[in-house]
Amino acid sequence: MMAATVVSRIRTGTRWAPVLWLLLSLVAVAAAVAAEQQVPLVLWSSDRDLWAPVADTHEGHITSDMQLSTYLDPALELGPRNVLLFLQDKLSIEDFTAYGGVFGNKQDSAFSNLENALDLAPSSLVLPAVDWYAISTLTTYLQEKLGASPLHVDLATLKELKLNASLPALLLIRLPYTASSGLMAPREVLTGNDEVIGQVLSTLESEDVPYTAALTAVRPSRVARDVAMVAGGLGRQLLQTQVASPAIHPPVSYNDTAPRILFWAQNFSVAYKDEWKDLTSLTFGVENLNLTGSFWNDSFAMLSLTYEPLFGATVTFKFILASRFYPVSARYWFTMERLEIHSNGSVAHFNVSQVTGPSIYSFHCEYVSSLSKKGSLLVTNVPSLWQMTLHNFQIQAFNVTGEQFSYASDCAGFFSPGIWMGLLTTLFMLFIFTYGLHMILSLKTMDRFDDRKGPTITLTQIV
């Protein structure tokens, strides 16, 4: 990580442990923050006292663009006018942890030249997590502050340049990074980048040119785990397998001059003669999905999905919807008239009239299926060889704006099994309470042996 480079400045064993533990805690915290939005930044200069110790590198802190400008302004105004920007394609603080030799294996470090530069630099600053937006505008910011255009250089062109301490210069050195196990391993690439940094700095030092250098990346090379990793403890997470989040595919969109019909389902499965096929991956997120036959107008719409081959034939699914005005509610309502499955010249019809709602809304239902155990919203008048199940089904064919669904009218009725259970339980408890209250109010004093008109009962005490 970024902080691992600072560790190299501490040579004695007595000072190693506390600093190492502090920096490793920064690694754990930065790994828990959304790393796809932050990259590390290392700054060092040949001038002294350009940066005060950073007080904001506490747990979870991310350096914003405004904070970064407060760190850079003193160096650009008071420091050397020659600025080097080592810009890597990908870099994360985890790279410094994995390949920086922070556990004492200094001979295996892939950042030996960078660590040596930080050791010898009179001024340095390490920011483990900088906001991606701040880094994306860093080159433009440096250009405005220095008043010099960025010059892309390599080792060959750098040796030919004659830098002047009084004239501003912004030198941009691009460093590659390969995170895959392709032609080169990440350690080899990082080591090669570190050698480039060492050669560039050696060239400047040989010419006795003062400079300020920065190392950062365009984007992170790794994606950190969830923030819950810190709250739950790192120890238990080390051997656990990270569960991949399910991919969210975009809805099917039928367009003529604008998006007209939107259709989405988390799972789209069809069966013919009890042989099931999952059409989800063939339907959503597919650029060349066959929508031939689809059409739309203000009162009628049809979404036609054609697959070939499917069950050994060309199969077309047609979702037919209509929008009508109802005077009672004084608004337009849409209804899915039917669902048709065309195959080998035959047509299977399903009645889907329960798929309905105001035309300004979309329709959503957890299950739209021909199976009885999943609601049977797809109803056929005659026995059919076809079955269909749509999980988390959503459709909108009228008043579509852009590629997003409107507010959804859900199929869940008010008197669901859970609601019935709650109502019956409440009524039963209310009956018990009413009966108990009635019994309490019906209590009477025991006056059976108390005759107020008769003689007084006298009890003689016998000793």
Swiss-Prot record:
Expressed in brain (at protein level). It comes from the Eukaryota. Accessory component of the multisubunit proton-transporting vacuolar (V)-ATPase protein pump. Interacts (via N-terminus) with ATP6AP2 (via N-terminus). Interacts with RNASEK. Interacts with TMEM106B (via C-terminus). It comes from Rattus norvegicus (Rat). Glycans are attached at N164, N255, N267, N290, N297, N344, N351, N399. The keyword Metal-binding does not apply. One of its GO terms (biological process) is endosome to plasma membrane protein transport. The keyword Ion transport applies. This is V-type proton ATPase subunit S1. The lineage of its organism: Eukaryota, Metazoa, Chordata, Craniata, Vertebrata.
